[in-house]
């Protein structure tokens, strides 16, 4: 029943809702977490109010992982339901245009504005930094490699529960610092493939789990795991010797994995509970917001850094109000810049 309904529409309504929601949470999160380094260093002693700190932790648990999952989810939909098939090199070029070229264009601007220093500049460091993704753009080269891996999985029909479990295990293994997006690849490949896998099991999931009982269960588990990760495990990490290492690399990483999975499933099932109802259709502004997500992601860190680091904004506004007002300014300006960029052909090629 669900599959038939989905084939009759071109948009994935759940994606049209989840994508702008997650980007909004991402901007909100950064509006809180970047304050301490804001105002040109004049507010390095700024401390988040305890309630705000918990808000950050609840958002932080699954927001960027959800973006990765949605990428694999849409790829799987296009492959399995729309029958889209790409040869390898045309697919690589498509993702270069979509991810790598915007990373380079905006990365150069970010480097010049916020990283460049005549005293420490070297061509080698510039190239490595640029190709690894300047600032928040690190997500783009990492996602590029995830797409290459997912193409191979799809092409050679490797989709299975065992692969999902294997990638989950790999995602919790510490990785060394590597350039070009490879450091975070093992962690995020699990979520991209998780989205791919989720689409293939979507009908089964809806048949067995699309109820408020499961939704509440996932949200409850997520809240518990957030509290464990931020209230209990920090004390365990202070232990020395073997027990401390187990807490740090075993329990800590496993808890974060379970926390992200529960948060993603809670959000996904909550949204799908509404989007699968007969006659549901997102408002036009929701679809428009989904189309603007890429631009908001790219621009928000530019606006945030300028606002927090190069103006006295943080010093002049009451601490209770700073993150909320900062969020409103950052989101508004990012949307405006996205709208202006999409008016040009070049802009549409970059973030359209």
Protein language model annotation of sequence segments:
Residues 156-166, 197-223:
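Hydrophobic alpha-helical segments of polytopic membrane proteins
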Residues 129-133, 173-184:
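Membrane-interface helix caps and helix-loop-helix hairpins in membrane proteins
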Residues 115-120, 173-178, 227-241, 309-314:
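Juxtamembrane "helix-exit" motif on the non-cytosolic side of transmembrane helices
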Residues 64-77, 141-151, 180-208, 256-277, ...:
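Specific transmembrane alpha-helix
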Residues 8-23, 92-93, 97-100, 208-222, ...:
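Functional transmembrane helices that form membrane-embedded active or gating regions
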Residues 24-31, 108, 165-179, 218-232, ...:
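Aromatic-anchored segments of alpha-helical transmembrane domains
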Residues 207-287:
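Alpha-helical transmembrane segments and terminal signal-anchor/GPI-anchor hydrophobic tails
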Residues 1-168, 314-352:
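Membrane-cytosol interface segments of multi-pass membrane proteins
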């Amino acid at each position: 029943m669900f599959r038939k309904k989905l084939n009759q529409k071109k948009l994935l309504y759940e994606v049209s809702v989840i994508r702008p929601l997650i980007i909004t949470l991402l901007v909100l999160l950064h509006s809180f977490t970047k304050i301490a380094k804001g105002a040109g260093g004049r507010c390095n002693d700024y401390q988040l109010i305890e309630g705000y700190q918990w808000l950050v932790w609840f958002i932080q648990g699954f927001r960027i992982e959800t973006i990765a999952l949605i990428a694999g989810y849409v790829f799987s939909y296009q492959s399995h339901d729309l029958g889209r098939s790409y040869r390898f090199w045309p697919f690589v070029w498509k993702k270069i245009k979509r991810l790598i070229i915007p990373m380079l264009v905006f990365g150069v601007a970010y480097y010049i504005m916020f990283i460049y220093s005549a005293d420490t500049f070297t061509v080698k460091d510039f190239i490595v930094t640029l190709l690894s993704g300047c600032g928040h753009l690190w997500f783009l080269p990492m996602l590029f490699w995830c797409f290459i891996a997912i193409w191979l999985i799809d092409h050679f029909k490797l989709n299975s529960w065992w692969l999902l479990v294997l990638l989950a295990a790999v995602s919790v293994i510490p990785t060394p610092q590597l350039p070009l997006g490879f450091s975070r690849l093992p962690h995020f490949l699990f979520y991209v493939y998780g989205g791919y896998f989720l689409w293939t099991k979507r009908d089964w999931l809806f048949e067995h789990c699309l109820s408020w009982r499961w939704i509440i269960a996932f949200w409850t588990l997520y809240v518990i795991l957030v509290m464990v990760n931020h209230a209990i495990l920090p004390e365990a990490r202070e232990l020395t010797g073997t027990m401390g290492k187990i807490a740090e690399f075993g329990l800590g990483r496993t808890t974060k994995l379970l926390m992200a999975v529960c948060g993603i499933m809670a959000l996904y099932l909550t949204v799908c509970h509404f989007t699968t109802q007969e006659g549901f259709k997102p408002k036009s502004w929701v679809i428009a917001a989904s189309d603007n997500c890429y631009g908001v992601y790219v621009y928000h860190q530019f606006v945030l850094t300028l606002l927090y680091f190069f103006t006295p904004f943080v010093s002049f506004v009451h601490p209770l109000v700073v993150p909320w007002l900062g969020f409103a300014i950052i989101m508004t300006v990012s949307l405006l810049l996205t709208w202006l960029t999409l008016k040009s052909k070049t802009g549409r090629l970059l973030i359209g």
